[in-house]
Swiss-Prot record:
InterPro entries: Kunitz_BPTI, Kunitz_BPTI_sf, Prtase_inh_Kunz-CS, TFPI/VKTCI-like. It is found in: Secreted. Residues 25-75 form the BPTI/Kunitz inhibitor domain. The lineage of its organism: Eukaryota, Metazoa, Ecdysozoa, Arthropoda, Hexapoda. One of its GO terms (molecular function) is toxin activity. Its main location: secreted. This is Tabkunin 4. Transmembrane segments: none annotated. It holds the Pfam family Kunitz_BPTI. Residues 1-20 form the signal peptide. Potent anticoagulant protein that inhibits the hydrolytic activities of all serine proteases tested (trypsin, thrombin, elastase, and chymotrypsin), with the highest efficacy on thrombin. Disulfide bonds join 25-75, 34-58.
Length: 76
């Protein structure tokens, strides 16, 4: 019985850590304070998917990815 309880606890912890989302993914879209127009992607936590936007080139936050694949791999 103790072994079964231990296995359950270990499994629960693994599931919890595997499903934990990176806090970067909850940051809002931030175009930055400069005026360039670099095509980038951010994770929209409301729609639960990566979306395109134009990054100004400076400032912003970490929810800023070069490709949709990179965005979804980190956050979806």
């Amino acid at each position: 019985m103790k072994v079964l309880s231990l296995i359950f606890v270990i499994f629960s912890v693994l599931v919890l850590f595997a499903s934990a989302k990176d806090p970067v993914c909850d940051q809002p879209k931030a175009v930055g304070r400069c005026f360039a127009a670099f095509p980038k992607f951010y994770f929209n936590s409301s729609s639960a998917q990566g979306e395109a936007f134009f990054y100004g080139g400076c400032g912003g936050n970490e929810n800023n990815f070069n490709t949709l694949e990179e965005c979804n791999a980190k956050c979806a």
